[in-house]
Amino acid sequence: MKIGLASYECRMNDIGFNLKQIEKAIVESKDADLVCFGEAFLQGFAAVTSDYEMDIRMAAEQDSLPIAKIRELSLQYRKAVMVGYIEKDGPDIYSSYALIEGGSVIHNYRRISKNWKNYNITNGNYREGTDTSPFLFHGVEMTVALCGDLWIYPESFRSRGLLIWPVYVNFDLDESESGEYAKQAAMACGKALLVNPLSKEPLSRGGAFF
């Protein structure tokens, strides 16, 4: 299985633009079987304001139109997609990462660490997940961790398979810094794929590493 890491630009609260970027990356991924995007790529990481009324309107349900568009793209181009998004589930909001193939969401990971929002002011409807179990995809054991998950709870992601680690960082991942990320990933898994989106506001410098 060939995996593409899509370090493409996303824009805050511009789902239309970000969906076009997802399609562009899928097309440009050529013979990749799976294309992985960064954390909260659909809406943009800073789309979370920690104002509940604003955020619940911004968040996307699994059966929402934006997710339906990605499901459609997975069918059209016959590729699997992994993408970060701010998820709405009833009255609750999560930072999630969906695996979509053949027009269906086949796995949905919810971030377990709380520092994706201002937890000092958010209400109880901003939730974290609890399930970090590996899953099989095309015969490959995979685990997903979102950004701070792996810094705070590395022991929760130990696996002999492949770790997918979408992040959102606003500094250059130079040799020394990427080395620190590699060390952190190695605490959980021997093989890891890290993907960071590009963004002008707030700044995110991108990057894709194995």
State where each predicted segment sits:
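Active-site beta-strand/loop signature of hydrolases that rely on acidic residues for catalysis
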Residues: I3, N18, V27-E53, S74, ...
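Amphipathic, non-transmembrane alpha-helical secondary structure
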Residues: G16-V27, A68, Y153-F157
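Recurrent small/Gly-Pro-centered beta-turn motifs in extracellular repeat architectures
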Residues: Y85-I86, N196
